[in-house]
Amino acid sequence: MKCVLSILLFFAVLLIACEKPAGPGGKAVIKGKVYAKNFDSYGYTLISEYYIGGENVYISYGSDNAVRNNVKTSDDGSFEFLYLNKGHYRIFVESRDTSIHVKNSKKTIAVVTELDINSVNQTVTLSDFVINK
């Protein structure tokens, strides 16, 4: 009887130990696009808007808010984070803070989306990130 319990306990621990945390190493994908609104130097007047290439998109995961990786958007504003495990993720992009109307203000804010990947092969397509430039 002790032998059977020991074997069951061993397999239970083995299954728990095999659970992969959020982050790289899986087959899931997070993708989306970044849309920019270009304002005048004071942040009042909208000059143009477009999907922006070359913009940094950041990812953090699990209970940690530290940036774990980043990618740049393609010319059409699209981005992808590939090969992710199941877990909790935060995707964010920096945006100019247009609530401050000072000429050429460099103050930025983070535009953040949080999500969970619940299956191994899941692909999550996010709503567009809208940022101010």
Question: How should these model regions be labeled?
Answer:
Residues 36-38, 44:
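Short solvent-exposed capping/turn motifs at the termini of beta-strands
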Residues 48-70:
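Short amphipathic beta-strand segments in non-cytosolic proteins
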Residues 87-93:
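A short tyrosine-centered beta-strand micro-motif
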Residues 14-17:
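C-terminal motif of bacterial Sec signal peptides marking the signal peptidase cleavage site
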Residues 74-83:
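Short, surface-exposed beta-strand/beta-hairpin micro-motifs centered on an aromatic residue
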Residues 28-36:
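A short, amphipathic beta-strand motif
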Residues 96-125:
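Structured interaction patches on ligand/partner-binding surfaces of diverse proteins
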Residues 2-9:
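Sec-dependent signal peptide recognition
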